[in-house]
Amino acid sequence: MLSQTRAAFFALIIFTFFSGQYAFAGQNTSADSSKMNVYFLSGLGADKRIFSNLKLDDDISVHHIEWAKPLKKETLAHYAGRIISQIDTTKPFQLVGVSFGGMIASEISEIARPEQIVIISSTSTGIPVSRFYRGLTRFLLLSPFAGPILKSANKTTYKYFSATTPESKSLLKAILHDTHTKFLKWALARTGSWEKKQRADNLYHIHGDQDRLIPIKLVKPDQVIAGGGHLMVYIQADEISAILNRKLMQEK
């Protein structure tokens, strides 16, 4: 159990650190009442790049949520309550969240009523961690060296993100460069203490069996992607696209 909690917290540290800067491009599609509004929350970069390889059905109206600057000591629930202003809740909508974005999507579902939540390479509930690793979190939050060290692209980060191609390595390097240190530290503190116990009823979880950041043995996904790592939404986009099109269009 201790080894599992250590692995879980290591995963939380890494994937939270790369949760992205709060300066995204705006929504990329115009409103169309005949289409299903789907809001995408990236956990891995400063913009929608992580979703750039997806091929989605024309009847899906894609919107990208912009990260906001977190308030001091703000909880994930309160943060979700602020960014929900970007969602038109007067019309049916769905949420798709990757990694950290999946956690925020789960918190949004406690406030609004999405038709469905799809999380990818994420967790639907908090993962328990040991006191030792909680202490490690506090140390990293106080260390002036945490940001520069953990924002560097190297063999270790490539390995844990399963960035095996030149294209995926280039993307990961750019993502790390764009990550805002203050956002990074806030996200680390909040995800490390996330205590959500109940999975949302209308949640669908897609996870890779080779995810090194959030090992599959620590979560209970609905759909397992063979050979999928943490960046599978980008690297195995065709397979993920097929699943998303099927699931999202079911609720239309």
Where in this protein do the model-derived segments appear?
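Bacterial N-terminal signal peptides
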Residues: 9-20
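Gly/Ala-rich beta-loop-alpha elbow adjacent to hydrolase catalytic centers
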Residues: 96-105
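Conserved alpha/beta-hydrolase catalytic His-Asp/Glu region
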Residues: 148-195
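Catalytic histidine-centered segment of alpha/beta-hydrolase-like enzymes
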Residues: 73-74, 228-243
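Flexible "cap/lid" loop of the alpha/beta hydrolase fold
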Residues: 113-146
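Conserved HGGG/HGGXW glycine-rich cap/lid loop of the alpha/beta-hydrolase fold
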Residues: 26-70
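Active-site loop/oxyanion-hole signature of alpha/beta-hydrolase fold enzymes
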Residues: 52, 57-94
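Short beta-strand/loop motif that positions the catalytic acidic residue
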Residues: 205-207, 211
